[in-house]
């Protein structure tokens, strides 16, 4: 019931003080039985529909219905109900590593939690009477004691937790120390056992140690032997006896690989010194390091023999752990790859030759030279194919600096006006509705009466400032509508009451849901005779847009843009929705926002229509907008005035950029022009590299496609110039979408502004058609167009562009040859003729058989011959054609195998023009 929910209060005004139940049911458009049931549920019993309902009883019924639908009786109660609830939204970002083939990929996971706290009714209803000062003091002391006790309990719990943790750590350390001691004891036992097993028996008793160390004699085969080492010099020292020279020679001669360096039972002093004190070595390692590798060469007693016997040079031939070892597994490198990389740079990072990388690319089906750039995905695939690991390089240094500037601009947030986008099907009255709100005539100024740009306006109403974005409704402007939905706060969907839901209406609903913005439906043209608002509500149910009348949450407002009916109600609904959203923004500091539309003005240069989302945009600010930059020379609002600054949710036109930015680019204000220029140049470089990679890939795909087809596709080249960037984007998407397997629409160049000499030269070189959308060619361009015979066409409505390009493309397709059967003859008997051979006596069972048309002979529904007629006779006369139900004689040229029961099929070939 609409009046019960406060949407049409005029019903209550029209009701008299005493009304019967029947009359009340007629006023609120509710069955009498249902109204009686609702009155009974509200606690009022009536015997019949003719009883009188007083104002008190009506208010009681109204309060009951409000409570039933979850509404408060008064605004004060509604405010109190809202104050009892608080909703907390929490977002948590996590990174999860998942396996993706040979590598692991990190995926960002966002966890959203929503929790609503409701204040209990008992807290307000069960509140005790005011306490006396003594009672308040006792209550405070009790709470203080309870708080102290809780703090003591918490401290005790934390102390016990710390004590348990320390005990666990100490226990773990003791276990580790015990394990180390056990391993050390086992190692010492193994060393002692190995030393006892390898120690030889003493040859003779050692002489008494002298107080001074004996001088070492020179080591030579003819010299005297060295005296034995004192007993306390080394724990491994053993008594030794002088050895004869021939014994040394024999020891050097019979020494083998891995044997002890021993001369007549005396251990080599150099080996003992070299490894003395290395207690960390096991017995086996000590023995291995003490061995002398290699075989002796030369005569016994020579210098080479002495080196091999364990002299000073013996350490060079030992194979210690620091010697070179050939790697047993390939080296896996971690290669950082940006958005694009040349094949030569990738080969250098992989430590491979450039030819090897080119071969790997060829095996993967990518034909590239060593100087060509490849994209990140291709480089990562070839890196994985060569056995290395690819990681994405972070080369956004200037982007990080830009983000840091944007974060510095954050300050105190204040309320901002809502940004409302008007969306809907073409000719449903979007611009007319906005025109009535603004009290201007914008719709009549658009070509064809349809909107082809995004119009941005802000309107000051009695309920505050509201910024409106008027989007086109034509199917070609899909990207414009999607861009408008992304930067908006509220979407007003305009639906004509006589037309209902149309394709672009459904698309607008999808854009609004994808952007996650609330929707308000304005049912327009209710003043027309065939208006049916209920039909609109039912059709939008299929798109999951449920009206409040049907139990949903979407507001439906019936308006008329022509006479202004319901416009104030629509503005109220927008203001109410904006209050619910609680829109906030930083009003001061560096500005940032989005480009809505851009164009090239002949007198003012590049002009960008931007929507400020944060901060304040002022004249003189340095701006970075996509790949363009510059200093703000002037600001203009929709009325042509120059405001001093533009705050959040205010659309303005900006002059002073270096070029025309693309619609949808984000802009941000920076400190100086140098940073702005560096960021813009880096973005331009990245975009150019990506474009080169994409063009190389497209060229290769075109070559492969031409190889796979015999004749290849017909190509229609176009040069598109328009007045604004949004129109260029819409034209490109709409015209390229006309391509199919037989013809391809190729846009070789597009841009904003008039048609220049370079545009004409490009069209002449590629034999392209020039399309000017709301722009004209200058004198030099017209001269080139006339001299080269270039097809130049001007348009102002996008419908005409699409239709004429379809006609031109259809002309390139040529004609298609089709065969159409015109008659069938049944062979009843076969006669022999001396002149024609076999002559078929036939009955025409369908259509007409003509002498000049080709025929086919079918036997058991299978074609056995295709040729032409040699003779067609009716009785004995030659005739040109024989119609259905007539007997005739047919002579088939160069075919004498006609049999009874065959069918002769007569057909003709016709040419049909091909269309897209």
From Swiss-Prot:
- Keyword Oxidoreductase: yes or no? no
Q: What is this protein called?
A: Translation initiation factor IF-2
Skewed-composition ranges (Basic and acidic residues): 151-191
Q: Region (G5) spans which residues? A: 560-562
Organism in which the protein naturally occurs: Xanthomonas campestris pv. campestris (strain ATCC 33913 / DSM 3586 / NCPPB 528 / LMG 568 / P 25)
Residue ranges of domain tr-type G in the record:
415-584
Mind listing the GO molecular function terms for this protein? Answer: GTP binding; GTPase activity; guanosine tetraphosphate binding; translation initiation factor activity
Q: Which family does it belong to?
A: Belongs to the TRAFAC class translation factor GTPase superfamily. Classic translation factor GTPase family. IF-2 subfamily.
Q: Which InterPro entries match?
A: DNA-bd_dom_put_sf, EF-G-like_DII, EFTu-like_2, IF2_assoc_dom_bac, IF2_II, IF2_N, P-loop_NTPase, Small_GTP-bd
**Where is the region Disordered?**
151-262, 280-328
UniProt function note = One of the essential components for the initiation of protein synthesis. Protects formylmethionyl-tRNA from spontaneous hydrolysis and promotes its binding to the 30S ribosomal subunits. Also involved in the hydrolysis of GTP during the formation of the 70S ribosomal complex.
In this chain, the stretch annotated as G1 covers 424-431
Q: Where does GTP bind?
A: 424-431, 470-474, 524-527
Q: Where is the composition biased (Low complexity)?
A: 192-243, 293-305
């Amino acid at each position: 019931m609409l009046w019960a929910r406060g949407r049409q209060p005029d019903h209550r005004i029209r009701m008299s003080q005493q009304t019967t139940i029947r009359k009340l049911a007629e006023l609120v458009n509710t069955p009498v039985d249902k109204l009686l049931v609702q009155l009974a549920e509200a606690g009022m019993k009536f015997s019949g529909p003719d009883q009188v309902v007083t104002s008190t009883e009506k208010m009681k019924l109204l309060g009951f219905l409000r409570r039933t639908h979850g509404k408060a009786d008064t605004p004060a109660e509604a405010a109190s109900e809202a104050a009892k609830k608080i909703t907390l939204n929490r977002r948590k970002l996590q990174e999860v590593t998942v396996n993706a083939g040979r590598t692991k990929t990190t995926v960002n996971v966002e966890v959203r939690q929503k929790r609503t706290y409701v204040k209990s009714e008992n807290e307000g209803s069960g509140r005790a009477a005011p306490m006396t000062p003594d009672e308040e003091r006792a209550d405070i002391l009790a709470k203080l004691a309870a708080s102290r006790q809780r703090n003591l309990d918490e401290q005790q719990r934390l102390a016990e937790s710390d004590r348990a943790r320390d005990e666990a750590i100490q226990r773990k350390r003791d276990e580790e120390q015990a394990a180390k001691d056990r391993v050390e004891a086992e190692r010492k036992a193994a060393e002692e056992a190995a030393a006892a097993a390898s120690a030889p028996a003493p040859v003779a008793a050692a002489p008494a140690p002298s107080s001074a160390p004996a001088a070492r004699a020179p080591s030579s085969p003819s010299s005297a032997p060295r005296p034995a080492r004192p007993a306390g010099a080394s724990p491994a020292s053993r008594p030794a006896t002088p050895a004869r020279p021939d014994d040394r020679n024999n020891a050097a001669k019979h020494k083998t690989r891995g044997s002890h360096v021993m001369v007549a039972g005396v251990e080599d002093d150099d080996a003992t010194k070299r490894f003395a004190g290395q207690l960390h070595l096991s017995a086996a390692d000590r023995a291995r390091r003490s061995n002398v590798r290699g075989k002796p060469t030369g005569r016994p007693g020579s210098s080479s023999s002495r080196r091999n016997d364990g002299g000073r040079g013996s350490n060079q031939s030992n194979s210690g752990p620091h010697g070179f070892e050939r790697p047993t597994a390939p080296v896996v490198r971690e290669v950082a790859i940006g958005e694009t990389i040349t094949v030569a740079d990738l080969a250098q990072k992989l430590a491979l030759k450039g030819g090897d990388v080119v071969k790997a690319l060829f095996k993967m089906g990518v034909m590239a030279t060593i100087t060509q750039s490849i994209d990140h995905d291709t480089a990562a695939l070839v890196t994985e194919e060569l056995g290395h690991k690819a990681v994405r390089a972070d080369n956004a240094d200037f982007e990080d600096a830009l983000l840091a500037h944007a974060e510095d601009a954050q300050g105190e947030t204040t309320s901002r006006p809502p940004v409302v986008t008007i969306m809907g099907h073409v000719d449903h009255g979007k611009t007319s509705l906005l025109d009535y709100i603004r009290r201007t005539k914008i719709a009549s100024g658009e070509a064809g009466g349809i909107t082809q740009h995004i119009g941005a306006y802000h309107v000051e109403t009695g309920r505050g400032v509201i910024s409106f974005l008027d989007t086109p409704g034509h199917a070609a402007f899909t990207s414009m509508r999607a861009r408008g939905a992304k930067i908006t706060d509220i979407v007003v969907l305009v639906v004509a009451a006589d037309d209902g839901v149309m394709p672009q209406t459904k698309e607008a609903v999808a854009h609004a849901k994808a952007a996650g913005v609330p929707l308000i439906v304005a049912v327009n043209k209710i003043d027309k005779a065939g208006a049916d608002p209920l039909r609109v509500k039912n059709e939008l149910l299929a798109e999951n847009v449920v009206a409040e009348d049907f139990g949903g949450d979407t507001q439906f407002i019936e308006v008329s843009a022509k006479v202004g009916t319901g416009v104030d109600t629509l503005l109220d609904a927008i203001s109410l929705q904006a209050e619910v959203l609680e829109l906030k923004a930083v009003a001061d500091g560096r500005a940032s926002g989005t480009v809505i539309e851009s164009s090239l003005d002949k007198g003012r240069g590049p002009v960008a229509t931007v929507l400020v989302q944060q901060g304040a945009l002022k004249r003189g600010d340095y701006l970075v907008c996509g790949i363009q930059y510059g200093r703000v020379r002037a600001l203009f609002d929709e009325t042509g005035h120059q405001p001093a600054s533009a705050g959040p949710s205010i659309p303005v036109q900006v002059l002073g950029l270096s070029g025309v930015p693309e619609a949808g680019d984000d802009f941000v204000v920076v400190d100086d022009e140098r940073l702005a220029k560096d960021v813009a140049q880096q973005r331009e470089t990245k975009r150019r590299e990506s474009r080169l990679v994409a063009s190389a890939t497209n060229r290769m795909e075109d070559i492969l496609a031409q190889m796979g087809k015999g004749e290849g596709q017909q190509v229609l080249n176009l040069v598109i110039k328009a007045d604004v960037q949004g129109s260029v984007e819409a034209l490109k998407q709409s015209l390229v979408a006309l391509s199919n397997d037989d013809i391809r629409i190729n846009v070789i160049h597009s841009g904003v502004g008039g048609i220049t000499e370079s545009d004409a030269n490009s069209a002449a070189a590629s034999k392209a058609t020039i399309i000017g959308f709301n722009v004209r060619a200058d004198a030099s361009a017209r001269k080139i167009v006339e001299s080269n015979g270039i097809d130049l066409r001007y348009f102002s409505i996008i419908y005409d562009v699409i239709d004429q390009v379809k006609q031109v493309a259809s002309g390139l397709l040529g004609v298609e040859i089709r065969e159409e059967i015109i008659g069938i003859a049944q062979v009843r008997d076969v006669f022999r003729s001396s002149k024609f051979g076999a002559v078929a006596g036939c009955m025409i069972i369908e259509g007409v058989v003509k002498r000049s048309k080709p025929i086919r002979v079918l036997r058991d529904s299978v074609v056995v011959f295709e040729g032409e007629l040699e003779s067609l006779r009716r009785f004995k006369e030659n005739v040109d054609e024989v119609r259905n139900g007539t007997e005739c004689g047919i002579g088939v040229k160069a075919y004498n195998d006609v049999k009874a029961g065959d069918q002769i099929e007569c057909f003709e070939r016709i040419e049909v023009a091909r269309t897209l």
